[in-house]
């Protein structure tokens, strides 16, 4: 069902991909850019402290993943071998659409360079910014929750096709708070922002995320956008649907 009644909420929590940004932008532009440029980025920035921290995190992650994934390789110590191993693992995880925090951190650094050099601009649907401005004018805080790193989220909104949108966003959450399919993640977000679960509206295109948020006590709406996965009728009935952000006003 499409929402036909006014929704009352005191905080807005937004998914990114498939909700306010097209899936094709992430799938067909951002991910392929990181896939193609991971080795090149490591070659150019290998000795930087931020890169070394992520490499160590990726080394520990590889050790864990090796237990359940035979395609993951152990990351060796020597520079060229290390770059080769990290590149192989990251490309493997991108292909598998893994939501792994250290991998997302490296993607964020790669995308930062792409944004800074003007190679990419963050896609945002045309209905998003006008509605967010109205919501902000009502002194309702707006938060982002995505599996992409907070760093990558900020980059997208600072370098969007609509300009710098970060001034109207109050905060960002990623997998450090918990996975998006886990009810506890939404409880933690409620605690951190100081707004009761029942007063938070969460918008997403993913049924499992809507289910987890709803179980935590949040209000939810499933967002239907071009290219999104087809929703079950059961989920539509349970959570309601919208096609643009105008429908939450």
Swiss-Prot record:
Residues annotated to bind substrate? 146-147, 180
The pathway to which it is assigned is: Amino-acid biosynthesis; L-methionine biosynthesis via salvage pathway; L-methionine from S-methyl-5-thio-alpha-D-ribose 1-phosphate: step 3/6; Amino-acid biosynthesis; L-methionine biosynthesis via salvage pathway; L-methionine from S-methyl-5-thio-alpha-D-ribose 1-phosphate: step 4/6
One GO BP on record is:
L-methionine salvage from methylthioadenosine
Q: Which residues are recorded as binding Mg(2+)?
A: 15, 17, 205
Instruction: Provide the reaction this enzyme catalyses.
Output: 5-methylsulfanyl-2,3-dioxopentyl phosphate + H2O = 1,2-dihydroxy-5-(methylsulfanyl)pent-1-en-3-one + phosphate
As for subcellular location, the record says: Cytoplasm; Nucleus
Query: Which top EC class applies here?
Result: hydrolase
GO CC annotations, alphabetized: cytoplasm; nucleus
- Needed cofactors: Mg(2+)
Supply the alphabetized keyword list.
Answer: Amino-acid biosynthesis, Cytoplasm, Hydrolase, Magnesium, Metal-binding, Methionine biosynthesis, Nucleus
* InterPro entries recorded: Enolase-ppase_E1 (IPR023943), ENOPH1_eukaryotes (IPR027511), HAD-like_sf (IPR036412), HAD-SF_hydro_IA (IPR006439), HAD_sf (IPR023214)
Indicate yes or no for the key word DNA repair: no
EC nos = 3.1.3.77
Pfam families in alphabetical order:
Hydrolase (PF00702)
Gene Ontology MF annotations: acireductone synthase activity; magnesium ion binding
Q: Which residues form a coiled coil?
A: none
Note accompanying the cofactor annotation = Binds 1 Mg(2+) ion per subunit.
Q: Which HAMAP family match?
A: Salvage_MtnC, Salvage_MtnC_euk
Q: Which NCBIfam families match?
A: enolase-ppase, HAD-SF-IA-v1
Q: What does this protein do?
A: Bifunctional enzyme that catalyzes the enolization of 2,3-diketo-5-methylthiopentyl-1-phosphate (DK-MTP-1-P) into the intermediate 2-hydroxy-3-keto-5-methylthiopentenyl-1-phosphate (HK-MTPenyl-1-P), which is then dephosphorylated to form the acireductone 1,2-dihydroxy-3-keto-5-methylthiopentene (DHK-MTPene).
Assembly behavior: Monomer.
Instruction: Give the family, as the similarity comment puts it.
Output: Belongs to the HAD-like hydrolase superfamily. MasA/MtnC family.
State what protein this is by name. Enolase-phosphatase E1
